[in-house]
């Protein structure tokens, strides 16, 4: 391993003009891999729509929308709910749901902090390989 990075380095291989050989051996933690078979449908749809491979941040956004949708179902809010009440009920509902997302299994603690496990990847031959 040449260097180690956090999830913020996910997507480094897709940076325009980046010499991917410079990332060879990079170890990083990320909850998403575009090369994971379980994400194949999302990756294809994303590539068809945007012409590039999605990174963790695209997957986080996708999971975030689905998490809010699940929390809305859990809270059972009517369309005309007061925004302050909606916020309180959604905050409570988030602590009761589990979402199977592109970035893994997501749960929220009583402070509203998401809980999910990252996976270690190494860049080898220009690809993310699970470490």
Which ranges hold each PLM region?
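Extracytosolic ligand-binding ectodomains
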Residues: 1-131
């Amino acid at each position: 391993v040449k260097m180690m990075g956090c999830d913020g380095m996910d997507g480094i291989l897709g940076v325009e003009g980046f010499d991917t050989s410079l990332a060879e051996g990079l170890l990083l933690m990320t909850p998403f891999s575009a090369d994971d078979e379980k994400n194949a449908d999302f990756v294809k749809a994303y590539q068809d729509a945007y012409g590039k491979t999605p990174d963790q941040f695209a997957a986080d956004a996708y999971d975030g929308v689905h998490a809010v949708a699940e929390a809305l179902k859990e809270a059972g809010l009517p369309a005309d709910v007061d925004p302050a009440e909606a916020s309180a009920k959604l905050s409570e509902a988030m602590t009761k749901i589990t979402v199977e997302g592109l970035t893994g299994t997501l749960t929220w603690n009583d402070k509203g902090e998401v809980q999910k496990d990252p996976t270690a990847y190494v860049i080898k031959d220009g690809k993310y390989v699970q470490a």
